[in-house]
Amino acid sequence: MGKYINILDDLTINKIAAGEVVERPSSVVKELLENAIDSGATQVVVDITDGGKKCIKISDNGGGILSSEVEKCFLRHATSKIKSIDDLFDLYSLGFRGEALASISAVSNIEMVTKTKEEMIGTKIVLSGSKIIKKEPVGTKDGTTITVKDLFFNTPVRAKFLKSTHAETINISDLINKLAIGNPNVRLKYINNSKLMLNTPGDNKLISVIRSIYGKEITDNLIEVDYEDEKIKISGYIGNCLLYTSPSPR
């Protein structure tokens, strides 16, 4: 007997699609942190609890989102970064697909508080498993704060595949360090279980970020690289002969 073909409902589609975007807590941090940077933020705070499995909170002072547009953020393929395929050839943002918030909201409890400088009052929206629970005006400063709680609460099978809290924290820390190095113009503060882990100055100097991450001893033993010709430009830092990693014992 032949099998019937089922047309999946939007909720099921979002849960399946979330697996491609949200693999673990570090995936959530990556998408939200990149969104914050793309918003024009100069200051971003990342605050996680229990390796991001319990709570991920990211606040920025970027452009914010208009109250009339807030609900659209959580629709699949809804983005402010492109309008047509032609825009891809002149794209400088970190993301553009418009899948992140839809995927994250499908497998978590999420709250967004946002305000643009053009509006007198901000907007708060709360979703659980893609469903809008509440939307209301709220007093807040310019920018956006997104809080993601109980990741994979409605997909327990996926929650079982998460690593230990320590391992998930290491993944998040590594990701944040890389994004901090790539965006020295952004003051990035990273808090893990109420402990300050990183606080970059946002002075647009790569060496300042390196010092914040690796400390003074390593920074003092770096050599600046700066090369440019007609086709390529290379800049950065390499370690001198005093920096090395001991080989692992055999």
Regions found by a protein language model. Give the residues of each.
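N-terminal phosphate-binding caps/lids of nucleotide- and nucleic-acid-binding domains
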Residues: 2-246
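Positively charged, low-complexity/disordered segments
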Residues: 248-250
